[in-house]
Regions:
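Amphipathic alpha-helical repeat scaffolds of TPR domains
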Residues: 1-10, 32-44, 48, 67-86, ...
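Canonical positions in the second alpha-helix
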Residues: 27-28, 62, 104, 191
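TPR/TPR-like (Sel1-like) alpha-helical repeat modules
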Residues: 124, 137-141, 181-199
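Alpha-helical junction/boundary sensor with strong preference for TPR arrays
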Residues: 32, 66, 101-104, 108, ...
Length: 216
């Protein structure tokens, strides 16, 4: 089914096999056509396989079709940030990434931790250390409040898997940008140890953590 194919493609990307995910997405499109999730993952595959100009074009199409979607903003922001990662002269791409992350985070009442920490990181890269710390602090505070409310109801914020991995490393990144480096290191190490099979996601997380640490 389309649903299972999308889950498998997402897992392949997270485990560090974007080319295989691209093959699966192509077969899925031939069988079922394309939808929003297919287009998002296809753009992510282009970025992860180094086809950045195609990825930027795909990101532009996604933003036109789904302008107020958290996942679209996150993927498109990541593509623009990767363009800057590859070429430090692409400061407009970095500014675009920051704009996407921050605006969508604010539209969502500052609930989405992934968008928030990336807004903080890109603010830091743009030279706004004070703004970055403010955003990161707001993210950490919101996550603490959420977890406190869930604990009171005997619930967990995530139920395992990729979503929980990103939740945990988002907290670690918020701590790092806030200057709480020892706590961040502990949080990163625990997440990496609990999800060692997510090699592709871990590689990206580590790269961003190294860049943040070098910029602080």
């Amino acid at each position: 089914s389309r649903f299972l194919a999308m889950l498998c493609a997402e897992s392949l990307i997270a485990c560090g096999h974007p080319a295989e995910a691209g093959d699966l997405l192509a077969r899925c499109a031939a069988a079922f056509g394309s939808d929003q999730r297919h287009q998002q993952l296809a753009a992510l595959v282009l970025s992860r396989t180094g086809r950045l100009e195609e990825a930027v074009t795909a990101a532009g199409r996604l933003l036109q079709r789904y302008p107020d979607d958290d996942e679209t903003a996150g993927i498109a922001g990541g593509i623009y940030k990767r363009r800057w990662d590859r070429d430090a002269t692409q400061t407009k791409a970095l500014a675009k990434a920051h704009e996407l992350y921050r605006k969508q985070w604010e539209k969502g009442k500052k609930i989405n931790a992934y968008l928030g920490v990336n807004a903080a990181a890109t603010a830091l890269y743009l030279g706004d250390a004070e703004g970055a710390r403010a955003i990161a602090g707001a993210v950490a505070e919101a996550m603490d409040k959420r977890d406190g409310a869930l604990a009171a109801a005997n619930l967990k914020p995530q139920d395992g898997g990729l979503a929980e991995y990103y939740d945990r490393v988002s907290r670690a990144e918020a701590l790092l940008v806030s200057g709480r480096t020892d706590e961040a290191a502990t949080a990163y190490a625990a997440a990496f140890a609990d999800y060692p099979w997510l090699a592709g996601s871990i590689e990206g997380t580590r790269a961003q953590a190294r860049r943040i640490a070098a910029t602080l």
